[in-house]
Amino acid sequence: MKAEYQGNEGFLQRDSVEHKGYAEAQSTDRREGKERDGASDLLEAILDRDNLNRAYKRVKRNHGAAGIDGVTVEEALPWLKEHREELLQSIRDGSYMPSPVRRKEIPKPDGGVRKLGIPTVVDRVIQQAIAQKLQSIWEPLFSDSSYGYRPKRSAQQAIQKVKEYAEEGYRYAVSVDLSKYFDTLNHELLMNLLHKQIQDMRVLRLVKKYLKSGVMENGVICKTEEGSPQGGAAVAFAGKHLPQ
């Protein structure tokens, strides 16, 4: 069954006064975003040399672990240089297939575990390159009250905003945590949201491949029919931000 996204107007009572003006600004920004970044050449912007170099540097700074192939960030660089054109061509013609992510469980303070999906370095670079371009498309559309995982935004700024609201007379704050959000993310819903701003079907198909790439756990590859691995930049960006 096809999932449809419906907004929830009035959910944030504190922002109800500014909602109308914000919605009008969203409408304008959406049109501009489509003209600027949602055209049929979005994949070429993702595969631009400068964007890919920036993506690799970001992956390197993060010092992440190796994926299922056991290749580290430093070891991947010579391969990327040697096979660059072959890799880019396979992405362009749609033959590229992402590798399954490596499952890793991180203990949580409450005694549970947080499941991470660690992609290979090559896939991390590609996903980071995608995420960088998705960020430029969606950033103008996000609520001004959103502070999580955004450039030049921080938890400290969110706390400061709560203090300002308290000084204005507001007395209640709500803390919400969605249980197993990334583990149960609906792929069809996510792709519908992406399609609203992206017309380059090659990009949509590539993101969907990452969602469906599977998980390797104890040497066994399992299909991923729902959920988004916490570890890949592109699917993590989409999972965190698009349902706003």
Which residue stretches match the model-derived regions?
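Conserved polymerase palm-domain catalytic core
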Residues: 90-105, 109, 141-244
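Short helix/loop capping segments that flank catalytic or ligand/cofactor-binding pockets
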Residues: 55, 126-127, 183-185
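Glycine-rich active-site/cofactor-binding loop and its immediate structural neighborhood
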Residues: 110-128
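Short alpha-helical scaffolding segments that buttress acidic/His motifs in well-ordered protein cores
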Residues: 55-59, 129, 206-211
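Amphipathic alpha-helical blocks
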Residues: 75-98
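Non-catalytic, polymerase-adjacent accessory regions of viral genome-replication enzymes
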Residues: 1-79
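Electropositive, glycine- and tryptophan-enriched low-complexity nucleic-acid-binding patches
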Residues: 127-146
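Residues immediately flanking
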Residues: 68, 132, 176-178
